[in-house]
Design a protein with these regions (language model features):
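Conserved, well-structured ligand/cofactor-binding cores
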Residues: 1-472
Length: 472
């Protein structure tokens, strides 16, 4: 005997009891039981975008004369409520699921249908009033609504990432200006190289992150091309001519994005290289951030027995056994996020490669990982900017000490005394610990005025076209 707080629903597999007050139906519940995979539900931004597509479809089908106005109006109203987040708890399907996203699509169709039924004074589950497939999913397929919702979600999620990268870039440029007067020794392969300004180090980081941001802004525009109207494989089966021509313009108006219908709907339905491209751009950004964080950890190492050229903000105790130890936890967590995103990129790449024939069934795992990559990277950039970059200070005295102790300045002397003499000075300095400057003056290779001019910070660290070099 069925319990009073349950209702009976049926699909092509059979009958199943569904909680009476639930807006989801039998197909969503069956999917929940089939896919207890991650414990993480469909991304909430994806839910909102899928609801926007349902709203656009209802409007288009009503204008096409295929959906009765009274049915279309309640579907549109229910979709708006979903967009506002009123039924988030009724989206019960796991983020990773079999079926190319059919379970997510049907979860949405059932929630909208049952809410629309309520609006028409019916009881949930009475699909003779509003049907999940016949009405809510009219002229659609999982194979066009799911990838389109995925693209809209990528666009939405990339916006805050772009803003976060802008703030990080500006913070790095500010530090570049703040530290521009400080000369330090540059390093290649972790060995002393030639002098540079600490500001140049941070300026290079800012340039790199700005490039990452521009790359992501550009790849986001690729998401504007959608396959709505393709239905199952690209033939537009079960659509009306009006729907086919107008679904994208109506969705464009609802979203505010300059969406266009793909020229080749077969290609747009079966090939997911666009998502791989987005993921690769995220990976590049993550790699660059991690490289920068590696540098920051090295430059801040110490505080007494390391490089110690900069100091990172102290955020928390660094050890449960060593008193006073403070670790570079923010750069460390950003690097871990980078490893995480690189792993996601591999998953996305393999999932895109694994599609067969006219459809790729692995969009759920692509979206699960892609959305997480964007969101996690955004959070990492925010904490890096706020809790690290803005609070970095320079240790100018330490930079000068290491610069003076280094033989790297001998490179600046090569045009004036020759490579061989400069190399001999470097070797002698390393052996005797006598500074290179002292040796130059001791052997009368240059006078003090000439030496000071050559070793001027800007002479050493900037290309100055009018600099005159004597013949040697």
């Amino acid at each position: 005997m069925m319990k009073e707080y349950m209702r009976l629903e049926s699909d092509s597999i059979g009958a199943m009891e569904v909680p009476k007050d639930a807006y989801y139906g039998v197909q969503a519940l069956r999917a929940k039981e089939n896919f207890p995979i991650t414990g993480t539900k469909i991304h909430p931004v994806f839910i909102k975008n899928l609801a926007k597509i349902k709203r656009a479809a209802a409007i288009t089908n009503k204008k096409a004369g295929r959906l009765k106005p009274e049915i279309a109006n309640v579907i549109e109203a229910a979709a708006n409520e979903v967009i506002c987040g009123m039924f988030d708890k009724d989206f019960i399907v796991d983020g990773i699921q079999g079926g190319a996203g059919t379970s997510a699509n049907m979860n949405m169709n059932e929630v909208i249908a049952n809410r629309a039924i309520e609006m028409l004074a019916g009881k949930k589950g009475d699909y003779t009033i509003v049907h999940p497939n016949d009405h809510v999913n009219m002229a659609q397929s999982t194979n066009d609504v799911i990838p389109t919702a995925g693209k809209l979600t990528v666009i939405d999620l990339l916006k805050p990432l772009g803003k976060s990268l802008s703030l990080l870039t500006q913070a790095l440029y500010d530090k570049a200006e703040e530290f521009d007067h400080i000369v330090k020794i540059g390093r290649t392969q972790l060995e002393d190289a030639v002098p540079m300004r600490l500001g140049q180090t941070f300026h290079s980081y800012a340039t790199m992150i700005s490039r990452d941001r521009n790359r992501l802004l550009k790849v986001a525009t690729e998401m504007y091309t959608v396959n709505m109207g393709a239905t199952a494989i690209g033939t537009a089966i079960n659509t009306s001519p009006f729907y086919f021509d107008n679904i994208v313009p109506i969705l464009r108006k609802i979203t505010g994005y300059p969406l266009t219908q793909a020229d080749d709907l077969f290609d747009a339905t079966e090939n997911l290289d666009g998502f791989v491209h987005v993921s690769s751009c995220l990976k590049i950004c993550a790699v660059n951030l991690s490289k920068m964080c590696n540098d920051l950890r090295i430059l801040a190492s110490g505080p007494k027995a390391g490089f110690g050229e900069i100091t990172l903000p102290a955020m928390q105790n660094g050890s449960s056994i060593m008193p006073g130890k403070v670790n570079p936890v923010i750069p460390e967590v950003v690097s871990q996020v980078a490893f995480h995103i690189i792993g996601h990129d591999t998953t996305i790449t393999m999932a895109a490669e694994a599609g067969q024939m006219e459809l790729n069934a692995f969009e759920p795992v692509i979206f699960y990982n892609l959305f997480d990559s964007i969101t996690t990277l955004t959070h990492a950039v925010n904490t890096l900017t706020t809790n690290c970059i803005l609070g970095i200070t320079a240790n100018e005295k330490r930079c000068n000490e290491l610069l003076d102790a280094s033989v790297g300045i001998t490179t600046a002397l090569c045009p004036y005394i020759g490579y061989q003499k400069a190399a001999s000075l470097a070797k002698e300095s390393l052996k005797t610990l006598v500074p290179v400057k002292t040796l130059v003056l001791r052997y009368n290779l240059l006078n003090k005025e000439e030496l000071d001019s050559i070793l001027d910070p800007y002479s050493m660290t900037e290309f100055i076209p009018h600099t005159q070099v004597k013949a040697i």
